[in-house]
Design a protein with these regions (language model features):
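Membrane-embedded beta-strand positions of outer-membrane beta-barrel proteins
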Residues: 40-42, 69, 95-97, 113-117, ...
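Transmembrane beta-strands of outer-membrane beta-barrel pores
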Residues: 42-48, 71-77, 99-103, 117-123, ...
């Protein structure tokens, strides 16, 4: 894999911005705040060895459950000189329901572990993850999911998402 100075510079910039956001916020926060919780998140994702980004929104239902939606798109490298857009093949939109263990396991307020199913345009999946909030607004997350089988997948590249592990990490913003 070839990396460039631009890639390293972007990673340093993102790390510096994350550090600045985290140090500028108070140190009292909840990673999951029940029915009062609304978050957006943005992060890096890797699905079966393909790199990409994900963005999502999550809303709390009660102290244990939340629901949300997320959009994932993976990098597509055109090795064969194809002119057609393959955006649909390398993108996925899904909805999910998460169970949060913060209350059950008596975890610190700024730390949460969650698990739940995902139904998307490409797959049916199960995810698990952790969140850590640095303040009332900003936090970080890490997530892993396994895409069990395809759902309504159409297109020319049917194997990008189904039956693959996906790993994600990024920032959360409480709204």
């Amino acid at each position: 894999m070839k990396t460039t100075h631009k890639t390293h510079g972007l990673a340093r910039l993102l790390a510096a911005l994350l550090l600045a956001f985290c140090s500028a916020t108070p140190l009292f926060a909840q990673a999951f705040d029940g029915s009062d919780d609304s978050k957006i998140y943005l992060g890096y994702t890797n699905v079966g060895g393909r790199h990409g980004v994900e963005i999502g929104y999550e809303e709390g239902i009660n102290d244990f459950l939340s629901y949300g939606a997320k959009f994932t798109t993976l990098r597509y490298k055109d090795d064969e000189g194809e002119k057609e857009s393959r955006f649909y093949d390398f993108s996925d939109l899904g909805i999910y329901l998460n169970y949060h263990f913060m209350e059950v396991l008596k975890l610190p307020d700024n730390f949460d572990i969650y698990v739940g199913p995902i139904l998307s345009t490409k797959t049916m999946s199960l995810q698990t993850g952790v969140r850590y909030n640095f303040g009332e607004v900003f936090g970080v997350y890490g997530s892993a999911q396994y895409n069990f089988f395809k759902t309504i997948t159409i297109g020319s590249n049917l194997g990008v998402y189904p039956e693959k592990f996906a790993f994600s990490a990024g920032i959360t913003i409480s709204i």
